[in-house]
Amino acid sequence: MNRYAVIGAGPSGLAAARALTRRGIGVDGYEAAAGVGGLWDIDNPRSTMYESAHLISSRTTTEFTEFPLRSTVDYPGHRVLRQYFRDYADHFGLTDRFRFETRVTRLEPQGGGWDLTSDGPEGEHTRWYAGVVLANGTLAEPNIPAFPGTFSGELMHTSAYRSPAQLAGRRVLLIGAGNSGCDLSLIHI
């Protein structure tokens, strides 16, 4: 039977792995971090999470319908969500399908499928898959626009922000009104 690779053990990767396994399709997962959670795992070095982060969509529109969130809080914080994703992965047997601390280093079309090369605790391996799902956290890389001129102060993208202590006693100019920018402006007003 054909197997599929899922790259990333965040919410999208877990949803893809669950959808495939529910249909009897074999799955091997790859995750660069040490555990399930993706960007919701503040301990993941690639995470852009900060201490006060919480859902911006309600719990009932975010949870997986077949596995409701135990929390009754409408907008739970990131630690509740990280645990929820870990519980979901354990409940549906997805955790054991992932190779953690393993990076995908190459993906090449081969024989109607894909050769996937990974590097992790087991060393470097190449395996063939009928298909590959990319759920590798595109938001982990900050998008920092170029500004003309020079600036002698510190520039910090919200992806490097973790807690209010980083900015305590400082004057800050916030550029941008995305979700993170709005959250941080409310924290520091």
Question: Residues of each region from the PLM?
Answer:
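Beta1/beta-strand and adjacent pyrophosphate-binding region of the FAD-binding site
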Residues: 1-12, 171-175
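Conserved small/polar residues in nucleotide/adenosyl-binding loops
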Residues: 187-189
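N-terminal Rossmann-fold NAD(P) dinucleotide-binding loop
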Residues: 13, 181
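Feature captures the FAD/FMN-dependent oxidoreductase FAD-binding
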Residues: 74-131
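Short hydrophobic core segments
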Residues: 7, 127-139, 173-175
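Glycine-rich beta-alpha-beta "Rossmann" dinucleotide-binding loop(s) and their flanking helix/strand
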Residues: 136-160
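Glycine-rich FAD pyrophosphate-binding loop
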Residues: 21-44
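Glycine-rich active-site loop/strand segments that organize a redox cofactor
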Residues: 39-83
